[in-house]
Amino acid sequence: MATIRADEISNIIRERIEQYNREVKIVNTGTVLQVGDGIARIYGLDEVMAGELVEFEEGTIGIALNLESKNVGVVLMGDGLLIQEGSSVKATGRIAQIPVSEAYLGRVINALAKPIDGRGEISSSESRLIESPAPGIISRRSVYEPLQTGLIAIDAMIPIGRGQRELIIGDRQTGKTAVATDTILNQQGNNVICVYVAIGQKASSVAQVVNALQERGAMEYTIVVAEAADSPATLQYLAPYTGAALAEYFMYRERHTLIIYDDPSKQAQAYRQMSLLLRRPPGREAYPGDVFYLHSRLLERAAKLSSRLGEGSMTALPIVETQSGDVSAYIPTNVISITDGQIFLSADLFNAGIRPAINVGISVSRVGSAAQIKAMKQVAGKLKLELAQFAELEAFAQFSSDLDKATQNQLARGQRLRELLKQSQAKPLTVAEQILTIYTGTNGYLDSFEIAQVRKFLDELRDYVKTRKPQFEEIISSTKIFTEEAQALLKDAIQEQKELFLVQE
């Protein structure tokens, strides 16, 4: 018969008591009262905070946006079809964040930074909050470096600098996205990371943009964040912040970034939908009262960082669609007041064959010539003045038949200058090519040509200078000044090409 030893038993009990760990885990939970239209009402979740992520029983994640006395309004990051009334919800103690890394370059992702291009998972060891505060005044420096778009009309007259926010605004089908994609194409070799955010666009339109970038090798330095028109409103609302978080990751690593939001008015519509379903009081055009803050906190994140922070930059180009040219609507006026200038695209100019259809008269850059190299300043001033005088004269000439010779010459010059601003899509020009084009027009070398011949002559002149006078481009790129030597080279090239051109014709 086995003997029971009291000391052994007491030792075992003592060990067990020492091992006992009284851990109390408090989980903040709630119960689904109602779900539908991408919104859930939750009873409980007493300790939840505004903007906190909550997790439903079947795995769907939501964001707590409305904290009311009797329930919590949650917007869902998915369709929520499997969420049932009465199921449990728990607070996660986290706010929305995404993984970030260099591996995102060349990929197409959604608002949660998950790849949607079928090319496998993206590895990353770091993460960033989707919403983070914009750099303060001390953290910034004024914009002084140009961000070249490759479009003469913009780089000469409405220059954009690194760290600026420039709005692209116009009716539908006026070439807004084309201006943005041309700007991305022109960053090739400039060490600029581009982020294109498509909000509520047709999936076919996004695919078209991605294909255009892939064909020209621009996806190597580009990230596309896409939430199509059929995506939940919550994800359309988050997509721009996801793009901004990715661009910020590179900006704080002393890199230059360009982010295109296409377009914030669709984000505002998604936010309006969420707000109305959460029963927040509607304001002007049924948008909620904080729709200005929605865009300002996004666009303020674009900055040129101070030298202490490494001089990285984030340039933002939001695209806003207007209805029949009405720029006084709520969202356009909001975004105009937040940005540092706007580029107006006109349907009338587009239909008249002037493409890019930029209305230079009412477009403006609040940074101005600070965002131009000296060589461009030297030639662009005259172009601006002559085009402004031409626009005035053209309006006057409609009412008058007998114009003197000087006025006729000025009108003829203006028509040729307008012609040199035309560019084909996906054919951005280098700064040197733009300078030689503007110089040729403003100094009267095009006056002897028919309007129909202008573009052909300029194309051939640019090729001629590139092959026969490579020193011209070298001088501009090395000194950034339109020197007398460069001017002499260009004059010779124009004369030689003119003779060749006239012989061919």
Swiss-Prot record:
Keyword Membrane: yes
Any one GO molecular-function label of the UniProt entry: ATP binding
Primary location group: plastid
Main enzyme class: translocase
Disulphide bridges: none
Pfam families noted in UniProt: ATP-synt_ab, ATP-synt_ab_C, ATP-synt_ab_N
Assigned protein family: Belongs to the ATPase alpha/beta chains family.
Function summary: Produces ATP from ADP in the presence of a proton gradient across the membrane. The alpha chain is a regulatory subunit.
Name the UniProt record assigns to this protein: ATP synthase subunit alpha, chloroplastic
Species assigned in the record: Oenothera elata subsp. hookeri (Hooker's evening primrose)
